[in-house]
UniProtKB/Swiss-Prot annotation:
Coiled coil feature spans: none
Domain F-box: residue ranges: 31-78
Name under which the protein is recorded: Putative F-box protein At1g32420
Superkingdom: Eukaryota
Bilayer-crossing regions: none
Signal peptide (residue range): none
PANTHER family documented for this protein: BNAA05G37150D PROTEIN-RELATED (PTHR31111), F-BOX DOMAIN-CONTAINING PROTEIN (PTHR31111:SF58)
Record region (Disordered): 1-27
The species this protein was found in: Arabidopsis thaliana
Compositionally biased tracts (Basic and acidic residues): 1-10
Length: 302
């Protein structure tokens, strides 16, 4: 009987020690399951995901939020991928509604919304807007506000107040492909020698909020503008409104230049477009529409 009890006690102690041992193994296994993935590998994995998934995964951890929303090289890779890949199924429709009351508004509708709904993905007061390399700059002069909108992430960035102009007539948006920088340029209604324009570099904490840039003399600005290969082109008139001419603004050097153009284009207002990576001007004439294309931009600068 004693031997049997000893055997039972031995079996009990053995089984309990085995349970403790197995529990320790499970616990150790659970700890070993937390694999520490290197940061570079995490970034490469996230680069493979679609934009919609990235929006959801920002809440996974602080590290993922920082990578997706703040890491410049990661954001640039996503933008480059979206520009080189075929258009997505989720197409964004952009509308600029010009009304007197409650004022001009800017809308973005997503094609994935049901057709019978009036819910929009974005609505903001905007007198005009410019699109450059995946970002949209919306500006309003009543009140004076400038917002940068990313249609992929649906995030806003409000540009600080200029503290110079109470009434902004024109706002241009450009991208410098060399330094990989977006810049906002605001100008008063009448561009005078004593009234410099101001430039703001988006996302650069080192630069001053706004910098004064001297221009090329007195001229009256037209709102139409386009940014091509790091240069903003726009049309203007002299102070009497009798002559039209083209002006270029180099986003990197922040310098203005006159652009040489045929006289027929300086006699009438034109619509500026990006025509296969070159500056194109659309002009209405008696015969219909004419499209002029600038072949060599460097030779056309004064």
């Amino acid at each position: 009987m004693k031997r049997g009890n000893e055997e039972n006690n031995h079996k009990t102690s053995s089984s309990s020690s085995t349970q403790r041992l197995s529990r320790r193994k499970i616990s150790a296994g659970e700890k070993s399951g937390n694999v520490n993935i290197p940061l570079d590998l995490t970034v490469e994995i996230l680069k493979k995901l679609p934009a919609k998934s990235l929006l959801r995964f920002q809440c996974v951890s602080k590290q993922w939020l920082s990578i997706i929303s703040s890491r410049r090289d990661f954001i640039d890779s996503i933008v480059t991928r979206s520009l080189t890949q075929p258009p997505p199924r989720d197409i964004k429709l952009i509308f600029h509604h010009q009304v007197l009351y409650p004022g001009p508004h800017f809308f973005i509708f997503s094609s994935t919304y049901p057709q019978n709904t009036d819910k929009e993905s974005l609505t903001t007061r905007a007198s005009s807007y410019h699109y450059v390399r995946g970002l949209i700059c919306c500006w309003s002069h009543c009140p004076t506000t400038v917002d940068i909108y990313n249609p992929t992430t649906r995030q806003y960035y409000t540009v600080p107040d200029t503290n110079r102009y109470q009434y902004i007539e024109t706002c241009f948006f450009g991208y410098d492909p060399v330094e990989n920088q977006y810049k906002v340029m605001v100008l008063p209604k009448y561009y005078m020698e004593e009234s410099p324009c101001q430039v703001f570099t988006v996302g650069d904490p080192i630069e001053k909020p706004w910098r004064d840039i001297q221009g090329i003399g007195v001229h009256f600005l037209l709102k139409d503008a386009v940014c091509i290969n790091g240069v903003i082109y726009y049309q203007a008139t002299n102070e009497y409104g009798s002559t039209y001419f083209l002006v270029s603004f180099d986003v990197r050097s922040e310098k203005f230049n006159h652009v040489k153009a045929p006289k027929i284009l300086t006699d009438h207002p034109c619509t500026l477009i990006n025509y296969q990576g070159k500056l194109g001007l659309i002009m209405c004439c008696k015969k219909g529409l004419e499209i002029w294309v600038m072949e060599d931009a460097e030779k056309k600068q004064d």
